[in-house]
Amino acid sequence: QTVSRADHGTKPLHKKAMFLFKQYLLVGGMPKVVSAYIEDNKQFENVDEEKREILKTYRNDIMKIDQNYQSKVLSIYDRIPGFLSSHEKRVKINSLDTTNRAIAYEETFFWLADSMICNECFSSNDPNVGLSLTEDRTYIKCYMSDTGLLFSHAFDEYPEVAKSIYSSILQDKLSVNKGMLYENIIAQMLVASGHKLYFYNHYNEDKHRNDIEIDFIIISGDKTNVKISPIEVKSSKKYTTTSLEKFNLTFKKRISNSYIIHPKNLSIRDDGIICIPAYMTFCL
């Protein structure tokens, strides 16, 4: 009941905060881009042009690196929007290299992360405190460090299309794979808060598919009681939480809190899962 009253009283504030969050999602945080947005009275044309200049600089920087892995870096960089728009969102090495050797791409991911172009997210095959001990580097997600840049990168071949749909997305009149953008910006915010990114998938042999898919796992709790916290990211107001519920049953003794990050207001479910609006991710 307390949560219900809080939700009712803060509805106008939540609506305003979500609008500002969507602005940030589309514009990003690059100083020149933000300046263009403010100076042009919150129009998007020059915003997109500034972002494309930054993306061009990234590509030029890649062309200057050691040729031994320059092509690998480019192949990952160019396909980031495609990987993130897929269901699993992870990099599929076999689509880049028929030998399917993930280890051959380790320097590639390191360069992209070290250059602050991307944020890495590794699979944990047995999530517990000390996530790096169960890290599986054969499975990786590669997020853009700036979600505004990801939006423009996704429309590299159709810049005029991108310019025409900014306002439509901002006003919720058009949906362009918001799941990709939401998950990317949550990754961006978690990294900014100091978290190293991990995810978890469980493959069901009988069903021949994943039956648990957790977007992010972070370390949480105080110094005397450190545990893990699973996070599911939802870009729409209607969703299911089967994966998170199964994960909680499987690893309940290891879990501090479980979170759903969604477009709706703050609430706590009867099963203890904490649902937070996307703009509150920095609190985790």
Where are these regions (language model features)?
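Interdomain hinge/linker elements that couple catalytic modules in large macromolecular machines
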Residues: 1-182, 196, 202
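A cross-kingdom feature that marks ATP-driven nucleic-acid transaction machinery
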Residues: 107, 113-284
